[in-house]
């Protein structure tokens, strides 16, 4: 149960971060008049990744209670076979996806840092400087959130493996 409770809490936080990022993007795009290229550049990653955070946060938050109840019921009915045939394969996929997410997030961080480094002193390229800063910020947030989710997933998977070892 702790795994699903923590998943739900983090997904709510993810949803809130996504909403804040989208609001920032709208403010940056439509309302900031000083250095507009910088803020328009920053708005794009905040909007794109913020929307992803909102969708992922909402979908995980809304499905977690039912998922927790279904899994608890099935483990209660047929612990070993359900865990072996359904829950461990599901978690194997989840854990494999974290590796993909991690590399994408690292690539975004590196891209953001390269853009920051290349365009930090170039007044004609403030769009890309803003883009790089926002991309790096969002990627670090995603990497951090996924790190903690992956750690919870490892603990949960270890608990599932104990059920099949008995």
Regions inferred by a protein language model and the residue ranges of each:
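Hydrophobic alpha-helical transmembrane segments and immediately flanking/interface helices
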Residues: 107-137
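Hydrophobic alpha-helical transmembrane segments of polytopic
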Residues: 17, 42-49, 104-108, 131-138
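Helical transmembrane-bundle signal
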Residues: 21-25, 50-60, 109-112, 135-142, ...
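Membrane-helix interface/capping segments
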Residues: 58-85
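C-terminal halves and exits of single transmembrane alpha-helices
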Residues: 80-109
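Cytosolic-side membrane-entry/anchor segment at the start of a transmembrane helix
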Residues: 1-30, 89-98, 144-164
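Long, highly hydrophobic alpha-helical transmembrane signal-anchor segments
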Residues: 3-54, 112-122
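Transmembrane helix-loop junctions in multipass membrane proteins, especially transporters and channels
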Residues: 30-37, 62-65, 69, 117-125, ...
